[in-house]
């Protein structure tokens, strides 16, 4: 992409010359992207499937639509006429975005094709493994319980079953024997983001650790697109859902180079500008590709404490064609604050106690409804070393107690 394809100047919000960005998906990650865009003078339109989403609370305008409805999505884009459309979730009518981009009616970040390929696990897995030749775990796809049984038999045990479309680990199961298949099928059906009934079976990799490699495609001073890598982020997942992350994750030099090579190969193919969260499994100097999100990643929330520019600032600047700085300033960690109970109105106790833990900060997302395992906030901690940061982040997160609050 050259300079003619980027935004050459930034207008003034809420005027006729405003530079307008529409976010499709307005959760906690979208909220931080919106804040970063607004600091750069961008007029932001936030869209989500439910009212009062975190990003709705800080945007210039907010809409509630079914984003998988192509007609409704196209109508809203045509109404607002944004300079950029920025998908922040997978469950979007990506075929509509492809049509509109091909017709020259909209610019999608990073590209409509990237949004389409990464909307489910099948598109990106086939691209990485079958087209690009990137190392992945062995896999099969299944549309029925019968096909799932055959897929598990082919892959062997242990294996992992996931819906082809889900988020935050929902619907994932680890299977140790054929006795686990039916429960895994039901779990996937309940946890899928869209009711396709299709799952992926993956061979279980006995990795040492897993990382997110935040990879940024941005315009350089020469007008060409350059790839930048943040320091690797380690993370702990429980049932496929992130509970802690830290930066940097120590890596064998050979493994780090392989991680860079894989991330660049995949993101070069996806194209466009912006930040990508590339998930990888690592065992000594061996690296396997897992997934990629063409947007900020939940494990990357640690960068709000660890980097000169957070992943949200990097994404905002990159998509606008502005310079980026991926430098890390300190080791840091994040720990999730869960809802702990079900309810529509939530209050938080212990925030002051959490902030008394050395080097900590807190982000409460403002979600209007709580579930026991819903991510309602995150504790951040910076320290001289990763272990201290992790301990402090966990300690701070544990001090915050979501409680039911009557209207």
From Swiss-Prot:
The keyword Glycoprotein does not apply. GO terms for molecular function: ATP binding; magnesium ion binding; phosphoribosylglycinamide formyltransferase 2 activity; phosphoribosylglycinamide formyltransferase activity. Its EC number is 6.3.1.21. Pfam families: ATP-grasp, PurT_C, RS_preATP-grasp-like. It catalyses: N(1)-(5-phospho-beta-D-ribosyl)glycinamide + formate + ATP = N(2)-formyl-N(1)-(5-phospho-beta-D-ribosyl)glycinamide + ADP + phosphate + H(+). Homodimer. NCBIfam families: PRK09288.1, purT. Belongs to the PurK/PurT family. This is Formate-dependent phosphoribosylglycinamide formyltransferase. It comes from Herminiimonas arsenicoxydans.
């Amino acid at each position: 992409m050259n300079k003619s394809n980027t935004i050459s100047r930034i207008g003034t919000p809420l005027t006729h010359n405003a530079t307008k960005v529409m976010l499709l998906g307005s959760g906690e990650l979208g909220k931080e992207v919106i804040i970063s865009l607004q600091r750069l003078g961008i007029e932001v339109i936030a869209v989500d499937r439910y009212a009062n989403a975190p990003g709705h609370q800080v945007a210039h305008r907010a809409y509630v639509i079914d984003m998988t409805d192509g007609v409704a999505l196209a109508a809203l884009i045509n109404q607002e006429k944004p300079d950029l459309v920025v998908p922040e979730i997978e469950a979007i009518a990506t075929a509509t975005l492809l049509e509109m981009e091909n017709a020259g009616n909209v610019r999608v970040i990073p590209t409509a094709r990237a949004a389409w390929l990464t909307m489910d696990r099948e598109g990106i897995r086939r691209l990485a493994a079958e087209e690009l030749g990137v190392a992945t775990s062995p896999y099969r796809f299944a549309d029925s319980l019968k096909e799932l049984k055959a897929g598990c038999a082919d892959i062997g045990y242990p294996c992992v079953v996931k819906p082809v479309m889900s988020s935050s680990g929902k619907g994932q199961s680890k299977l140790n024997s054929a006795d686990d298949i039916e429960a895994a099928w039901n779990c996937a059906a309940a946890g899928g983001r869209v009711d396709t009934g299709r799952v992926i079976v993956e061979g279980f990799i006995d990795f040492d650790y897993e990382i997110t490699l935040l990879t940024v495609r941005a315009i350089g001073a020469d007008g060409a697109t350059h790839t930048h890598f943040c320091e690797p982020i380690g993370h702990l997942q429980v049932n496929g859902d992130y509970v802690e992350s830290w930066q940097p994750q120590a890596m064998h030099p050979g493994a780090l180079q392989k991680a860079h090579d894989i991330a660049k190969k995949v993101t070069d193919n996806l194209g466009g500008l912006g930040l990508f969260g590339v998930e990888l499994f690592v065992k000594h100097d061996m690296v396997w590709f897992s997934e990629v999100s063409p947007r900020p990643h939940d494990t990357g929330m640690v960068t709000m404490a660890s980097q000169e520019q957070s992943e949200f600032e990097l994404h905002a600047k990159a998509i606008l064609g502005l310079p980026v700085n991926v430098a890390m300033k300190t080791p840091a960690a994040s720990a999730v604050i869960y809802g702990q109970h079900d309810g529509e109105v939530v209050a938080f106790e212990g925030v002051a106690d959490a902030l008394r833990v050395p080097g900590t900060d807190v982000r409460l997302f403002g979600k209007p409804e709580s579930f026991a395992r819903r991510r309602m906030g995150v504790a951040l901690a910076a320290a001289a070393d990763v272990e201290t940061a992790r301990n402090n982040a966990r300690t701070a997160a544990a001090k915050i107690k979501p409680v039911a609050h009557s209207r």
